[in-house]
Swiss-Prot record:
Magnesium is required for activity, even if it seems to interact primarily with the substrate. This is Dihydropteroate synthase. It holds the Pfam family Pterin_bind. GO terms for molecular function: dihydropteroate synthase activity; metal ion binding. It catalyses: (7,8-dihydropterin-6-yl)methyl diphosphate + 4-aminobenzoate = 7,8-dihydropteroate + diphosphate. GO terms for cellular component: cytosol. It comes from Staphylococcus aureus. Keywords: Antibiotic resistance, Folate biosynthesis, Magnesium, Metal-binding, Transferase.
């Protein structure tokens, strides 16, 4: 049975929108990682820079100071480690320690050394769709054009196709209607044959799905609904805060999809 990968979020920042300040020392971060592993995480995604609206950009040195001690403490654990960074200097420092994946919210567009660095260490990379929100074509077409162009550049740099993930970038440079359009057409991203990572957890999109104001934690059940929907559309991994809820849900949806496929094959 094909298993949907669960990427657990570990923000080692003081200002992330959902859990800023909760895990920004090594001891609390390690405790959280162990808990997420017990809950079913296949990947831990460590992030040292907040992506909330209006966040303050920090220096490379500050990002390294936040991320490296945590990575050093967890890199030997029996779980894949991803680092959420768009800076090749941070990526390389973490890859030297044995990190498996670089999760680049700018898909190599911010730092043109990123692909060479990831290829050098034979690692995986997540390419997320981003931008300034100004586009000359419909959002899905622009997303596909941009991500496929960057995936091509990643392959030229030496990263094999099976180590390139695509993320549609829910919550980044899109209107509410554009995010809804991207979700409805996830299967078109899946059809590229690159593995797709869906990252909606606790974002504005999930609040708007509920139709009323909520705290980030109160959006977990709706996040799980997007997980189920994404899996049915063919995504291979989901990036979430609430690992236990989404891992259980994904296991159930994976079973049902496998059962459906088996019945179709039998008939």
């Amino acid at each position: 049975m094909t298993k949907t990968k669960i990427m657990g979020i570990l923000n080692v920042t003081p200002d992330s929108f959902s859990d800023g300040g909760k895990f920004n020392n090594v001891e609390s971060a390690v405790t959280r990682v162990k808990a997420m592993m017990d809950e079913g995480a296949d990947i831990i995604d460590v992030g040292g820079v907040s992506t909330r609206p209006g966040h303050e950009m920090i220096t490379v040195e500050e990002e390294l100071n936040r991320v490296l001690p945590v990575v050093e403490a967890i890199v030997g654990f029996d779980v894949k480690i991803s680092v959420d960074t768009f800076r090749s200097e941070v990526a390389e420092a973490c890859l030297k320690l044995g990190v498996d994946i670089i999760n680049d919210q700018w898909a190599g567009l911010y730092d043109h050394r990123m692909f060479q660095v990831v290829a050098k260490y034979d690692a995986e990379i997540v390419l997320m769709h981003n931008g300034n929100g100004n586009r000359d074509e419909p959002v899905v077409e622009e997303m596909l054009t941009s991500l496929l162009a960057q995936a091509h550049q990643a392959k030229i740099a030496g990263i094999p196709s099976n180590k390139i993930w695509l993320d549609p970038g829910i919550g980044f440079a899109k209107t509410r209607n554009e995010e809804a359009e991207v979700m409805a057409r996830l299967d078109e991203l899946v059809a590229t044959e690159y593995p797709v990572l869906l990252a909606t957890s606790r974002k504005r999109f999930t609040k708007e799905m509920m139709g009323y104001d909520t705290t980030p934690v109160e959006r977990d059940e709706v996040t799980a609904a997007t997980t189920a929907y994404g899996i049915m559309k063919g995504v291979r991994a989901v990036r979430v805060h609430n690992v236990e809820l989404n891992a259980k849900l994904a296991k159930g949806i994976d079973f049902l999809k496998e059962n459906e496929n088996a019945r179709h094959n039998f008939s």
